[in-house]
Amino acid sequence: MKKWVTAAVCFFAFFLLAGQAEAAGKRKIAIDPGHQGSWVDMSAQEAMAPGSSETKAKATTGTEGRFSGVPEYELNLRIALALKSELISRGYEVVMTREDNDTAISNQERAQLANDSGAEACIRIHANGSDDSSVSGALAMAPSEQNPYVGNLSAESVRLSQCVLDSYCERTGLSNDGVIYADDMTGINFSEIPVTILEMGYMSNE
């Protein structure tokens, strides 16, 4: 877990692979640091997808480092702000869904903010947890082609996810657990641009 504070730079291989680094004037990327502070009550329900009767909490606090005690919402923001700073230094425009742990913003609202911003893609930053402290590795999530809401974004989102994940794992040395389909994530289902959720690793291991 100690590697993650500096892991933001690992995302840049995605931009290089995509041939966008030299054309950064001005490419726009949305970054969503997952979750938020436990004192911000976001337990009210919202639709999981447009028109869906299934609901989920507007936002949650996420997991917590078993050995560090660091909450996921704090780690996600720390990494996201480092990534934002580096991207700006390279000439990119960056849209953040939150820049503190106090902001009350739901997963629907995060997706809509990214949609309305003119960003070309959205990277949602998260971390995993497990009851087994030996479990490690990183993975990424994207919508499947069968997703009834954003199946049209599947191919681009999978490519985005694979590039980000491969680059991240190559630079950090973490095992690559691959891209999985996630059709029950509010932030994915309300997206109108290519989107990925990067699960940076397990906060339950050292």
Language-model segments: residues:
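Catalytic-site microenvironment of enzymes
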Residues: 1-206
